[in-house]
């Protein structure tokens, strides 16, 4: 219950109590007696509830209890507002029966039942909630019990007071009469009223206290209730908070669960995607690998198809090249035929001129003989006379100039001057004339030389490397036995008979008809010519050198002059010997290029070559030339007695001359010169073989001993190459011999040095050269097989022979050295070993060719030993034939040759490597093959060529057989043949290189061969030295060689092949006629 409710209840109770208290009417007595006082009495009667309560309390407790019970009962049956007294008057004798109107005791007691009832029954809106009912009921019960007790007490008090009041009033009535008693009563009543008031006040205080207590209880209860409510609310809030938290937790958990599920789904999705991606990549990789594999297969297939296509194209190209080569060869053959006709006409003219020359020579010789007889007592005077005669002969000889060109376009030498060399004696004159004629004839290259025919003297360039060799070694026309040579020289049989003595003619025939003449003849002529050649060589060389010394060959360096002076000192004997034994050598005496040509380079080179051969020290002039020349000189020595003799004659290849062996001035007397040059040359040869490089170095040094030949091959890019048809083995040997100096060069170097030294010093009889040649031939034949080795061995033989020969070493030194073991040596001196295959002249031409080849080979040895292989291969019969062809020095550009040379050069340029060797080899092989055609032509065109033609045909057949074998081998070893080509020379030619070179060179080879065959037919050179112009460098590329060959100043070039050699190579076939022309 709220405090407000409690206070309301208290007021209600008080109201009830007030209603229940009824005061009776004032006693009448009172009213009457005390009118005014009555009012005061009424006033004194308690009006307020407190008063009533105080009166009630004064009622006796019994009464109050009774009343309570009664009032209780009545209250239950009537509204609380009505007083119970009206309905049931109290029984008499009780306090309730007291009528207050009359007596104060009659005042009915207060009935508090209604208040109790009201208190017990609260309005609906004030009822406590069920939760609190229990507490409130207990509170009310306590509260009402206490109130009831208080009311009962109050009633008792009231009743007692009323009773007392009645007693008092009764007493008053009793004592009314007396005022005193009345005032006393009033005082007592007043006291009672005061006491009642006090009691009422006390009661009121109690009631107030009770109310406060109740209020406190109520407030406490309210507080407790609020606290409870707050607690409940807090609990509720906590519950709600817990529920909210739980909800949040559930939500969070749910969210986390969903997040986890989502994450798992994403992870699963990712893994699935990754797996799909991986599978996709694997599939792509697989496809890519498959594609790559397929592409690789396609590429491999394409490559295979491309390779097949390339092979087919290569095969077609090769076939086309072969066809083109064949066509070129045919063209060359046709051209050679035309050139042969031209050459024959030119030879006829030359023969006529030579007849005149021979006549003049004969007269000169007779005059010289007479002078010699007259001055025989005085050697010095005799020497001077010979020098004078030599000069006269030289003067009488009209130089002839010709142009050397390689191919149609490239001109190696715009103008080559050949000055005829006339022997000092009549013999020399004749030989010189003959040689001159031979040179002129041989120089169909001489068409350019207007003076060729007019000159009666043999040009000092005994060998025209351009492909023309002097017809024979004979110093005099008489010595020329070869009909081919005669035809080349334009000499008739009568003219030839007019030539120098038969001994010379024997030698020259040996050399000239070395091809056509039987081996016996060549051997006989060789023997005779050995002595004659040595003597003639010495005389011619000395004369030449004297002329050079005296300024005839002003272009010669001092070396030429020195040798000339030396020669002059020793010339008398040398010259005579040369004339007598000169046969081929004297005839082939080569005018020093320096003398002949103003070009300092040519001169220096030629001279250097001369000296390099004769006096290597002098040779220093042109180190490159010297380098090559020593080897060339060595080669020349090894090549053939002719070439060697030419070398001995101090002939050198003029640097400017495409390929001329020009006499290099002897250092001293022919003997001393030869010994000097011979030893140097031998050393050089040996050195050049072992030292091709050394030879080159020596040449450069110029101190190198000149080759005993006295011939310095002019050093150019090209080297003379002697082509003998040989087996591939022979070719290889020849290659090694020439190129490596293993075959020819080494022996040449060794032999030349030893034999030259010995020959020069010993000056053994010219026979020794013959023997040496013979030995060389014998040795050379084997050396064909193993040319490099054999050539060395043969060279030593040559040396020993040369040593034996030393009396005439100067003349014969060349033969001694010339018996180039590789090829030239064998055929040169003693055709006997080869007679079966060749006439002595043939062998001689071979020898000269070999000697030249050797020189060339040595030169080419410097280059790469290309030539060596060629000569070594040729050492066989085929070799000799090839040698003959080789002996032609294709270098000299005879007009008809120039064209073929140019073609061959072009061809070589096209196929340089093959041409370099192949043209040589192929030219040789072709010479053998084409040789028959050329030989036939030559035979048909030349009367004296019948025998040579037969020999050549035989050789040609052999060569063709060899060529077929070589070609087969070359084809088989085509891949490896480049080296072999050099080594195999001829066989290489047949090989692919051969095809290539032949394609490039076939023209040259065919032309050379044909020309050589023609030359061989002419057989002016007993040993046809087929000098093929080969790259001194074994490197097959002929184009380079050609370019090198072209420059006349190439002497400096280390590649020893002179330009003329290159031409010779290119023109190998065309030059097949050259050896004969040279002869």
Swiss-Prot record:
Any Gene Ontology biological process: negative regulation of barbed-end actin filament capping
Polar residues bias (residue ranges): 420-434, 670-682, 756-781, 984-993, 1020-1033
Cystine pairs: none
Tagged with keyword NAD: no
Amino acid composition bias (Basic residues), ranges on this chain: 115-134
GO CC annotation, single: cytosol
Domain of life: Eukaryota
Biased composition (Acidic residues): 36-45, 140-158, 684-695
Record's signal peptide: none
Cellular location(s): Cytoplasm, Cytosol
Composition skew (Basic and acidic residues), residue ranges: 1-11, 64-76, 159-293, 896-930, 944-983, 994-1016
Chain intervals for the UniProt region annotation (Disordered): 1-293, 308-327, 341-383, 420-453, 493-522, 606-639, 658-1054
Stored Pfam families: DUF4592
Protein's UniProt keywords contain Cytoplasm: yes
Keyword terms: Cytoplasm
Assembly and interaction partners: Directly interacts with actin-capping proteins; this interaction decreases the binding of capping proteins to actin.
Stated role: Involved in epithelial cell integrity by acting on the maintenance of the actin cytoskeleton. Positively regulates the actin polymerization, by inhibiting the interaction of actin-capping proteins with actin.
Protein name listed in UniProt: Capping protein inhibiting regulator of actin dynamics
Record lineage: Eukaryota, Metazoa, Chordata, Craniata, Vertebrata
Gene: crad
């Amino acid at each position: 219950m709220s405090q407000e409710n409690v206070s309301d209840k208290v007021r209600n109770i008080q109201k009830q109590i007030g209603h229940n208290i009824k005061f009776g009417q004032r006693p009448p007595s009172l009213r009457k007696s005390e009118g005014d006082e009555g009012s005061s009495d009424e006033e004194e009667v308690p009006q307020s509830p407190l008063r009533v309560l105080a009166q009630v309390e004064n009622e006796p407790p019994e009464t109050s209890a009774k009343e309570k019970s009664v009032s209780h009962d009545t209250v239950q049956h009537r509204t609380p507002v009505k007083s119970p007294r009206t309905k049931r008057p109290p029984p008499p004798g009780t306090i309730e029966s007291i009528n207050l109107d009359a007596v104060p005791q009659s005042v009915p007691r207060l009935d508090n039942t209604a208040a109790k009832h009201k208190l017990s029954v609260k309005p609906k809106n004030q009822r406590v909630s069920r939760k609190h009912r229990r507490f409130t009921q207990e509170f009310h019960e306590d509260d009402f019990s206490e109130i009831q007790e208080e009311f009962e007490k109050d009633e008792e008090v009231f009743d007692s007071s009323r009773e007392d009041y009645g007693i008092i009033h009764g007493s008053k009535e009793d004592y009314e009469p007396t005022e005193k008693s009345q005032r006393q009563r009033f005082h007592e009543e007043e006291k009672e009223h005061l006491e009642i008031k006090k009691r009422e006040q006390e009661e009121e205080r109690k009631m107030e206290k009770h109310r406060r207590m109740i209020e406190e209880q109520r407030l406490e209860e309210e507080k407790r209730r609020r606290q409870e409510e707050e607690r409940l609310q807090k609990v509720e809030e906590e519950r709600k908070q817990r529920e909210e938290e739980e909800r949040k937790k559930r939500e969070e958990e749910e969210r986390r669960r969903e997040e986890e599920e989502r994450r798992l789904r994403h992870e699963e999705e990712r893994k699935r995607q990754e797996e799909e991606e991986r599978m996709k990549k694997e599939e792509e990789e697989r496809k890519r690998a498959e594609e790559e594999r397929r592409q690789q297969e396609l590429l491999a297939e394409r490559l295979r198809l491309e390779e097949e296509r390339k092979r087919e194209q290569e095969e077609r190209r090769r076939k086309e090249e072969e066809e083109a080569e064949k066509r070129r060869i045919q063209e060359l053959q046709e051209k050679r035929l035309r050139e042969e006709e031209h050459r024959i006409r030119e030879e006829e003219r030359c023969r006529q001129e030579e007849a005149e020359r021979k006549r003049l020579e004969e007269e000169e010789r007779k005059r010289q003989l007479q002078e010699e007889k007259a001055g025989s007592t005085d050697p010095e005077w005799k020497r001077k006379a010979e020098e004078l005669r030599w000069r006269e002969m030289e003067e009488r000889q009209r130089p002839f100039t010709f142009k050397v060109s390689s191919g149609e376009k490239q001109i190696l030498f715009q103008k080559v001057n050949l000055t005829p060399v006339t022997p000092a004696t009549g013999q020399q004159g004749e030989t010189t004339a003959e040689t001159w004629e031979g040179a002129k004839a041989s120089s169909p290259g001489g068409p350019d030389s207007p003076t060729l025919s007019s000159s009666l003297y043999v040009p000092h360039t005994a060998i025209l490397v351009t492909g023309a060799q002097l017809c024979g070694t004979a110093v005099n026309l008489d010595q020329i036995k070869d009909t081919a040579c005669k035809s080349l020289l334009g000499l008739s049989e009568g003219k030839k008979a007019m030539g120098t003595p038969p001994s010379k003619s024997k030698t020259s025939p040996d050399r000239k008809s070395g091809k056509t003449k039987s081996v016996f003849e060549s051997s006989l002529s060789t023997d005779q010519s050995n002595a004659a050649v040595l003597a003639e060589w010495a005389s011619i060389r000395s004369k030449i050198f004297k002329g050079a010394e005296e300024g005839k060959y002003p272009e010669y360096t001092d070396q030429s002059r020195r040798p000339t002076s030396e020669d002059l000192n020793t010339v008398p004997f040398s010259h005579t010997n040369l004339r007598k034994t000169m046969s081929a050598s004297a005839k082939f005496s080569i005018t020093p290029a320096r003398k002949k040509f103003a070009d300092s380079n040519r001169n220096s080179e030629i001279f250097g070559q001369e000296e390099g051969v004769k006096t290597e020290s002098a040779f220093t002039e042109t180190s490159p030339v010297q380098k090559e020349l020593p080897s060339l000189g060595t080669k020349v020595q090894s090549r053939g007695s002719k070439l060697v003799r030419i070398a001995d004659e101090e002939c050198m290849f003029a640097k400017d001359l495409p390929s001329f062996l020009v006499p290099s001035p002897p250092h001293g007397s022919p003997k001393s010169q030869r010994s000097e040059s011979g030893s140097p040359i031998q050393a050089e040869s040996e050195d050049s073989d072992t030292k091709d490089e050394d030879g080159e170095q020596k040449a450069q040094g110029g101190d190198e001993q000149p080759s005993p030949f006295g011939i310095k091959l002019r050093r150019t890019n090209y080297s003379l190459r002697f082509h003998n048809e040989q087996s591939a083995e022979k070719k290889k040997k020849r290659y090694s011999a020439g190129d490596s100096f293993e075959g020819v060069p080494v022996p040449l170097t060794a032999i030349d040095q030893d034999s030259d030294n010995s020959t020069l010093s010993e000056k053994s009889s010219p026979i020794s050269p013959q023997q040496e040649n013979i030995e060389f031939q014998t040795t050379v034949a084997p050396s064909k097989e193993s040319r490099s080795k054999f050539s060395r061995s043969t060279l030593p033989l040559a040396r020993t022979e040369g040593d034996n020969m030393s009396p005439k070493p100067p003349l014969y030194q060349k033969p001694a050295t010339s018996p180039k073991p590789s090829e030239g040596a064998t055929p040169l001196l003693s055709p006997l070993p080869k007679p079966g295959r060749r006439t002595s002249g043939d062998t001689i031409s071979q020898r000269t060719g070999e000697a030249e080849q050797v020189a060339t080979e040595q030169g080419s040895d410097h280059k790469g030993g290309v030539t060596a292989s060629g000569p070594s291969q040729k050492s066989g019969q085929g070799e000799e034939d090839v040698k003959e062809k080789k002996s032609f020095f294709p270098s000299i550009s005879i007009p008809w040759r120039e064209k073929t040379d140019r073609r061959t050069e072009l061809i070589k340029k096209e196929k340089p490597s093959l041409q370099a060797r192949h043209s040589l080899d192929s030219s040789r092989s072709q010479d053998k093959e084409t040789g028959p055609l050329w030989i036939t032509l030559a035979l048909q065109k030349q009367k004296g060529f019948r025998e040579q033609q037969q020999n050549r045909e035989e050789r040609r057949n052999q060569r063709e057989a060899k060529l077929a074998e070589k070609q087969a081998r070359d084809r088989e070893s085509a891949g490896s043949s480049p080296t072999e080509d050099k080594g195999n020379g001829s066989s290489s030619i047949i090989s692919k290189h051969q095809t290539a070179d032949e394609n490039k060179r076939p023209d040259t080879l065919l032309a050379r061969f044909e020309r050589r065959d023609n030359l061989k037919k002419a057989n002016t050179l007993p040993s046809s030295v087929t000098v093929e112009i080969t790259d001194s460098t074994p490197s097959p590329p002929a184009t380079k060689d050609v370019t090198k060959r072209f420059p006349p100043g190439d002497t400096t070039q280390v590649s020893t092949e002179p330009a003329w050699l290159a031409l010779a190579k290119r023109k190998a076939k065309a030059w097949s006629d050259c050896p004969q022309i040279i002869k």
